[in-house]
């Protein structure tokens, strides 16, 4: 093993000088291990990742944990390989940090477990699968208007506190319960409390045995937040490539991946780009996203929560992510304020899969008619606000009448929110969703009170609620 010495520490960035002309390769992992010799020192067990060759036998590295206690002159060892993490069955039901070390107090990973490097090339063109298959989520607004593709990339857009994490939790629940699929959850720069809650909820619901979890949370240095998405992706790739599984990869939050990159970029000596982001933003994003795909062996379907800074969709971070996505689920604060959950904007959310040759003619026509009705309602709202409903034509009154029922029927109760709402969650198959909206558009339920359509699953639940109110059905 080749040894070097720390010559400079700048926050999370550490410069190391090596001896005898040896230079570790880019992305190699370096180790610093130091036992405290007195009470003023701390034990150090730190991993660094090589980012730049500066010349003069010196490399600039990014720390994967806090650099507290580091001093110049400390010994550094080149491990000769990139960071590698455990993969396979041993990861299921466990929680890891960026280095693949378990952090759930459930014991160590077996020493003979397979470990894969977190940096690998994307699958070759000839290995990719080309057929398009829909992934049923059981969430009406998603399945009807912006369906997810197996092996696709889906973005969950929204500002702070509109329900991104709850939607992700529901998707994990539904995929595990209804499809029996394996999920990998990468918590990138989000709240530790949320990660802890998610872990315990998944343990209680029995979903944890089908899930591997990796966390690099808000309190951790940018190096950990930058690389933790790759750790999760490496675990997911094993299930796809070696076991031929269809894997779900959840990343919460992909914006923090970009944010962590921008934090270290200036310290690495790069000139900032637009809005202060790193000049390598598109490259870094591409290296991550191109590994998430369907191959002839299996697929990785990725659902990424994307924080939109100040609700500005032109910000370079969300804008760069957009170009990689097959579907977007936009969460709208106005809908959350109206009590419509999930607060998915039915007009702004899009999917490449909403085409008659993929979802079928009936589904496509119903979805487009729903969007048409909601768009017309949106246009009429200004007139209603100024002149009132009475000034509308009979045709427009009917549009408003049905649009409000559609808007409420796009909401539903979630299994993971049962403890807050006291209402049982609902999983609605795509066929039932299409049938329900088709019947609303045909005017079959025009006589039922609109508030009965709120937070229900199937159309039959609306009828039951109306009956309970004493309405003649």
Curated annotation (Swiss-Prot):
SUPFAM superfamilies: C-terminal domain of alpha and beta subunits of F1 ATP synthase, N-terminal domain of alpha and beta subunits of F1 ATP synthase, P-loop containing nucleoside triphosphate hydrolases. The keyword Transport applies. GO terms for molecular function: ATP binding; ATP hydrolysis activity; proton-transporting ATP synthase activity, rotational mechanism. Its EC number is 7.1.2.2. Gene3D superfamilies: 2.40.10.170, Bovine Mitochondrial F1-atpase, Atp Synthase Beta Chain, Chain D, domain 3, P-loop containing nucleotide triphosphate hydrolases. It comes from the Bacteria. Signal peptide: none annotated. It is a peripheral membrane protein. The keyword ATP-binding applies. GO terms for cellular component: plasma membrane; proton-transporting ATP synthase complex. It is an enzyme of class 7 (translocase). It is found in: Cell membrane. Keywords: ATP synthesis, ATP-binding, Cell membrane, CF(1), Hydrogen ion transport, Ion transport, Membrane, Nucleotide-binding, Translocase, Transport. F-type ATPases have 2 components, CF(1) - the catalytic core - and CF(0) - the membrane proton channel. CF(1) has five subunits: alpha(3), beta(3), gamma(1), delta(1), epsilon(1). CF(0) has three main subunits: a(1), b(2) and c(9-12). The alpha and beta chains form an alternating ring which encloses part of the gamma chain. CF(1) is attached to CF(0) by a central stalk formed by the gamma and epsilon chains, while a peripheral stalk is formed by the delta and b chains. Produces ATP from ADP in the presence of a proton gradient across the membrane. The catalytic sites are hosted primarily by the beta subunits. Belongs to the ATPase alpha/beta chains family. This is ATP synthase subunit beta. It comes from Geobacillus thermoleovorans (Bacillus thermoleovorans). The gene is atpD.
């Amino acid at each position: 093993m080749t040894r070097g010495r720390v010559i400079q520490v700048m926050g999370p960035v550490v410069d190391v000088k090596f001896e005898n002309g040896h230079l570790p390769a880019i992305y190699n992992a370096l180790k610093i291990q130091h036992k405290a010799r007195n009470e003023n020192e701390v034990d150090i067990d730190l991993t660094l990742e090589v980012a730049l060759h500066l010349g003069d036998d010196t490399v600039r590295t990014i720390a994967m944990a806090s650099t507290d206690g580091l001093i110049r002159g400390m010994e550094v060892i080149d491990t000769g390989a990139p960071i590698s993490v455990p993969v396979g069955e041993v990861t299921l039901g466990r929680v890891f940090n960026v280095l693949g070390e378990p952090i759930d107090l459930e014991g160590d990973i077996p020493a003979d477990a397979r470990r894969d490097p977190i940096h690998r090339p994307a699958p070759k063109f000839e290995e990719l699968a080309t057929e398009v298959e829909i992934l049923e989520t059981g969430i009406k607004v998603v399945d009807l208007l912006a369906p997810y593709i197996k092996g696709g990339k889906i973005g969950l857009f929204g500002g702070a506190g509109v329900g991104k994490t709850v939607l992700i939790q529901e998707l994990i629940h539904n995929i595990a319960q209804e499809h029996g699929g394996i999920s990998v959850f990468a918590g990138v720069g989000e709240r530790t409390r949320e990660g802890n809650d998610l872990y315990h909820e998944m343990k209680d619901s029995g979903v944890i045995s089908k899930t591997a979890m990796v966390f690099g949370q808000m309190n951790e240095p940018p190096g950990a937040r930058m690389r933790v998405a790759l750790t999760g992706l490496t675990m997911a790739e094993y299930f796809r490539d070696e076991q031929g599984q269809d894997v779900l990869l959840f990343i919460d939050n992909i914006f923090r991946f970009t944010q962590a990159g921008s934090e270290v970029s200036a310290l690495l000596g790069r000139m900032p780009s637009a809005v202060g982001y790193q000049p390598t933003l598109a490259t870094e994003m591409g290296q991550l996203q191109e590994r998430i795909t369907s191959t002839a062996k299996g697929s990785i379907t990725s659902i990424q929560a994307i924080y939109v800074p100040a609700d500005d969709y032109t910000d370079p971070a969300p804008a760069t992510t957009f170009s990689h996505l097959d579907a977007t689920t936009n969460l709208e604060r106005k809908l959350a304020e109206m009590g419509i959950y999930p607060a998915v904007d039915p007009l702004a959310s899009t999917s490449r899969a909403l085409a008659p040759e993929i979802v079928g003619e009936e589904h496509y026509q119903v979805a487009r008619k729903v969007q048409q009705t909601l768009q017309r309602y949106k246009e009429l709202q200004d007139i209603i606000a100024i002149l009132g409903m009475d000034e509308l034509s009979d045709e427009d009154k009917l549009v408003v009448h049905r649009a409000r029922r559609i808007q409420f029927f796009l909401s539903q109760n979630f299994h993971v929110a049962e403890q807050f709402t006291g209402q049982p969650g609902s999983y609605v198959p795509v066929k039932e969703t299409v049938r329900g909206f088709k019947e609303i558009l045909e005017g079959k339920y025009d006589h039922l009170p609109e508030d009965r359509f709120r937070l229900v699953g199937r159309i039959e639940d609306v009828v039951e609620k109306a009956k309970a109110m004493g309405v003649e059905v």
